[in-house]
Structure formats: structure tokens, C-alpha cells
Amino acid sequence: MAEAKMIEYHPMNDLKTSSLEYHSRKPAGKLQIKITKPIRSVDDLSLAYTPGVAEPCLEISKDVKKAYQYTNKNNLVAVVSNGSAVLGLGDIGALASKPVMEGKAVLFKHFAGVDAVDIEIDEKNPVKLANIIEAISPSFGGINLEDIKAPACFVVGEILKKKLSIPVFHDDQHGTAVIVSAGLLNALEIVNKKIEEVKVVMTGAGAAGIAIAKLITALGVKKSNLFMFDSKGLITANREVNKYKAEFAQPPHQSPVCQE
């Protein structure tokens, strides 16, 4: 296979032109499938497919855990999105989100050696979306949810957590929460403050915001010291909000940021 030509990108270059050239250069996109076993003879073909392929199939039918031994399930993640909350772009739909999901699969492979397949699903109903993901899950060793709008993403995650035996990771929730929490713990160590005593103000109550709030309160931040703002202001108990925001609502008429 010919070596791919490198694009020299400079901040002064036109980003749109460079990006479109990068993605359209043949082969288009950023992913392809690699064969991991030799196919040099008829015998090789008879092992890769019929009749030899029947043997691992029979083994897996007797013990599903053997799928990790005989297939790529042990190193394969599904990057799943419906394109309803793509960073910086919003609800652009399943197909338009494909370049982003391919990009996330590239990160898995390049930085961790984990094979990943991007799967874009045209479904906004969270229960139906979860059911689709559950149906395709046997092929994968893990599920990475990506760019699914809140609060639907919480519903999808809760359903899959109950139904699947493989890891389910929502980057926008869990990845962001881990990073922010680590930053908070390090900052508190530097200023010599206890996590139980500090007040935390959060701007944003979507997928990332709620997940961050859950993790930092689990680490010791008191809910009474956590002040979460959404697009309409401070989340308080007298506002009509979804149950995920309501968990972190403050009493009405609270203005604690100005209080000691």
C-alpha cells in the first residue's frame, strides 16, 4: 500500500481547506480493515472461512467467553453515536457525525492499540437507541457512547449498564468527569484546602456537568456546596428541571456564591 502523503498544517493555513483535503484523500475517511491472519493458500481460506471456521463457532456456542479467545472481541470497541450533541456542532444527525466517530476510533487505535468501529445510529428515542446498542453488543468487548444529547444519554447509559456484561463508557460524561475531578483534587492539594469545605460553582448541566457533579460529590464535595447553573441560571428546587438536574438543586432564593 502506498505511503499516505503528509499534509503540513500551519495555524495560518485555511483549516477548512486542509481538513476537507485530509478527509477526502483516497482512501476517503480515516479507517480501514486489516486482515490479521495469512491468506496465502486454499488451506488458509478453508481455515478463515468454511469449513474450518465452524470449529471456533462450535466452541463459542458451548462457552460464550471463548469469543475472546477466537475472535477480535477481546480488542474491539464500538464508538456509538446518534449525532444529537456533537461538540461545537450540536444536533447534526447520525451520518454527519461519522467523521467525528471515525476520529475517536483513530484515537483508540493510535494511542492505545485498541481496534474501534464507528457506528452511527439514526435514532433519537433513548430506549430504542439503547435496545439497538444492546442488540449489536455481542460483537464488541466494550461500548463507547459519544455525542448523545442529555438527558437521553443518561437513559441510554442506565439501560445498558443493567443489561450488558461488557464495559459501557460515555466519554462526554465519564471521561470529562475523571479529568475535571483530577484537576480539582490537585488544585485543592496546592491550596491546602479540604474537599468537604470548598464551594464549587459549575456552569453547565448537560452530560458532562451532571457526570462531574456525581463524581466530585462522591469524592467528598457536599451537595449543599455545589451550585450548578444551566442556561436559565442556578438550578433550584422550585424550578422545573429533569431528575438528573434536580439531584443537585439548591433551596430557592439561594445566592451562596456571595456568602462566606
Question: Where do the PLM segments sit?
Answer:
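N-terminal ligand-binding/catalytic initiation module
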Residues: A2-V168
